[in-house]
């Protein structure tokens, strides 16, 4: 029974582990199929591929932060070419938007709380390949202003209005397909820390996402119980969508989510249930 995790983050975005550490964790946890899905960047994929042992199947991926009509969502791209021009053009635009958001948050913290970052801290923030509020939260925790990232974001960052810096979902799906990849709706009932939507709320959104070109659903997820998973698997089957699954592992930056955890019970899920892996590895 092969163990898989198709939703993993490194410090190329907002994960705490570098690639070498991540590979060690993957090996120690006996994972045999993995995907690197950093937020809005593909930069780690080539290096990760070179570090992964040969007995582990590595899938190059990305997680794009999107809006599809009025649906705020994350779209995973699997089996992508990280050098694809259309995908990289989109990602480069995203980097500029993230820097604008970063500047807004820095100014907000200064004006609202009198918090000013040192030159070294600012240099570190601006050097991130895909800067997110987690990085700011890390600095606030180091200063002793909060006990963890969640507290730092809740108390200092979340109230800051930054405007919409999400990708247009249709363009994101197009870019993933242009890169030879498979677009999959990530944690479609709600992600880590989010309120899970009801089945009645989900179904109309699913129809919209299908019309925009998604080809799969992340049915197995670290925060989904068996009832939610079975519902999503049925929806995937009814709509001829591929099934994916992942932990959404971020290391210390999202505590309580071990790598390889694909349900709330943390029971082993055979990779054969993730139909997308068979398609990618045997296509």
Locations of the language-model features?
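Catalytic core of soluble alpha/beta enzymes
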Residues: 249-283
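Short, low-complexity, polar/charged sequence segments that are solvent-exposed and flexible
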Residues: 22-25, 78-80, 94-98, 236-238, ...
């Amino acid at each position: 029974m092969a163990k898989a995790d198709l939703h993993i983050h490194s410090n190329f975005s907002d994960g705490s582990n570098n690639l070498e550490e991540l590979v060690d964790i993957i090996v120690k946890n006996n994972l045999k199929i993995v995907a690197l899905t950093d937020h809005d960047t593909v930069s780690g994929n080539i290096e990760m591929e070179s570090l992964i042992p040969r007995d582990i199947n590595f899938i190059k991926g990305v997680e794009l932060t999107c809006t599809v009509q009025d649906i705020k969502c994350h779209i995973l791209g699997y089996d992508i070419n990280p050098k694809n021009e259309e995908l990289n053009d989109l990602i480069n635009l995203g980097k500029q938007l993230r820097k604008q958001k970063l500047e807004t948050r820095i100014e907000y913290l200064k004006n609202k709380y009198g918090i000013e970052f040192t030159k070294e801290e600012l240099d570190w923030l601006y050097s991130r390949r895909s800067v997110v509020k987690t990085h700011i939260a890390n600095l606030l925790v180091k200063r002793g202003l909060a006990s963890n990232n969640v507290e730092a974001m809740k108390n200092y960052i979340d109230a800051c209005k930054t405007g919409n810096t999400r990708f247009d979902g249709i363009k994101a799906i197009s870019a993933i397909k242009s890169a030879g990849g498979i677009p999959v709706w990530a944690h479609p009932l709600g992600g880590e820390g989010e309120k899970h939507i009801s089945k009645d709320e989900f179904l109309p959104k699913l129809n919209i996402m299908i019309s925009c070109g998604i080809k799969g659903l992340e049915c197995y997820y670290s925060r989904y119980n068996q009832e939610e998973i079975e519902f999503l698997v049925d929806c995937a089957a009814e709509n001829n969508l591929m099934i994916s699954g992942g932990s959404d592992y971020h290391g210390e930056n999202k505590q309580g989510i071990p790598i390889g955890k694909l349900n709330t019970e943390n029971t082993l899920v055979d990779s054969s249930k993730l139909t997308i892996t068979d398609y990618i590895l045997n296509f």
